[in-house]
């Protein structure tokens, strides 16, 4: 293994290049800082990333470096959120599962990919570890590969491997992965989790996200049997279910006996569980999020969250009004794939009201809010006040159902808005 310094490695980046930085908790921070240190020598470098969870704000995303770097994110996480909402960086709306197509088709050409990889095995293969998602296709489409070799990166199996002969420069950078603390569900989240868990049958295949409500759902599944996992992000919450044999993947049609994800984020406990574990398969996001793959599994239960839902079932999950908070991610991919699965169900979960007392069920979405899941795709909506099924319901019927799970303090106001919008059609709904 021939190693060079980070400063030497990033000299392969030229002005005008397009650079992809591996995301999730796999950000190669040694390489990112070395690239940023070359700002005075570089101009017009496009820097792409997605769901990059760093220890601090991205160092290249600063107003004073705008002539050197143009930061672009497909899904906003903590290290670019401030820069994007200040206009220093930009977000590209895209379904996560379709971004590899943008790379492979040349619509977004890439010159350089920066990776954070495991040490090579005896055959010279390094693992991308906890993040194959976009990295797999980015490597495939880039002219130059620069890798930070990290003894803390777990070795995972599936798509995320690269031979040292394919890497143009390798740098030693032993950094523990960023840990994402497990969110302990509060009482509201537990009530929502219980409503959703009651709809999940034995033998279901789970897609479940990150946060208090997903963890509450997982906590409520400990009496279930023969569950499977085919998800975008694998977190700590699924590990106890796997270890107890509740998630055994025995009834899945694709990768039976193995859990499937495209990225993993959580505590060191999760990373230790993944290291060398062939019971977990990490795949390219173009594969994990393909609805035609998702639908092959039985009883797909897609559990996702939202920022607000309007009375017709339009779901905003990426922004708070005009302020970008996250991105589309794989919500659409799994809502669609889950709907096509035999016995599948798709859930959107959210508290009925914010901590500031603002209703999350609204007459119309806030000005500037993005529609991540359309009202044509909406199925189950759950709050702490219940769960309702919107599919095949008229707009007036949907409004009636959604008002029934809104916070009691706003139901009268929502009813007035519904009458004004739907008129006699709303009044006729039983």
Predicted feature residues:
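Conserved alpha/beta enzyme-core scaffold
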Residues: 1-430
């Amino acid at each position: 293994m021939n190693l060079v310094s980070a400063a030497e490695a990033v000299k392969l980046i030229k002005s005008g290049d397009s650079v992809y930085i591996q995301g999730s908790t796999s950000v190669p921070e040694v390489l990112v800082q070395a690239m940023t240190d070359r700002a005075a020598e570089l101009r017009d470098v496009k820097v792409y990333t997605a769901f990059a969870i760093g220890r601090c704000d991205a160092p290249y995303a600063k107003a004073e470096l705008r002539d050197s770097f143009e930061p672009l994110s497909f899904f906003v996480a903590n290290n670019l959120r401030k820069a994007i909402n200040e206009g220093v960086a930009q977000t590209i709306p895209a379904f996560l599962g379709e971004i590899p197509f943008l790379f492979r088709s040349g619509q977004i050409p890439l010159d350089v990919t920066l990776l954070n990889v495991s040490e090579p095995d005896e055959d010279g293969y390094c693992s991308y570890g906890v993040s194959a998602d976009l990295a797999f296709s980015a490597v495939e489409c880039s002219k130059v590969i620069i890798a930070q070799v990290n003894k803390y990166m777990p070795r995972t199996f599936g798509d995320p491997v690269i031979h040292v002969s394919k890497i143009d420069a390798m740098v030693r950078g032993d950094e523990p992965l960023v840990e994402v603390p497990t969110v302990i569900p509060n009482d509201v989240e537990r009530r929502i989790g219980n409503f959703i868990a009651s709809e999940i049958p034995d033998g279901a295949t789970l897609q479940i996200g990150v946060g208090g409500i997903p963890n509450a759902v997982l906590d409520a599944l400990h009496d279930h049997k023969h569950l499977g996992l085919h998800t975008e992000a694998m977190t700590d919450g699924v590990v106890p279910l796997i270890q107890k044999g509740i998630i055994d993947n025995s009834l899945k049609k694709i990768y039976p006996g193995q859990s499937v994800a495209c990225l993993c984020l959580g505590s060191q406990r999760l990373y230790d569980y993944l290291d060398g574990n062939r019971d977990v398969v990490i795949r390219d996001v173009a594969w994990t999020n393909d609805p035609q793959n998702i639908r092959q599994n039985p009883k797909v239960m897609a559990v996702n969250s939202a920022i607000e839902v309007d009375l017709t079932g339009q779901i905003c999950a990426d922004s708070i009004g005009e302020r970008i908070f996250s991105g589309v991610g794989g919500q659409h991919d799994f809502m669609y794939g889950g709907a096509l699965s035999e016995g599948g169900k798709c859930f959107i979960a959210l508290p009925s009201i914010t901590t500031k007392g603002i209703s999350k069920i609204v007459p119309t979405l806030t000005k500037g809010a993005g529609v991540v899941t359309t009202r044509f795709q909406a199925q189950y909506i759950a709050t702490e006040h219940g769960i309702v099924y919107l599919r095949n319901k008229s707009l007036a019927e949907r409004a009636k159902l959604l008002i029934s799970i809104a916070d009691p303090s706003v139901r009268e106001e929502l009813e007035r808005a519904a009458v004004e919008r739907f008129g006699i059609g709303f009044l006729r709904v039983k």
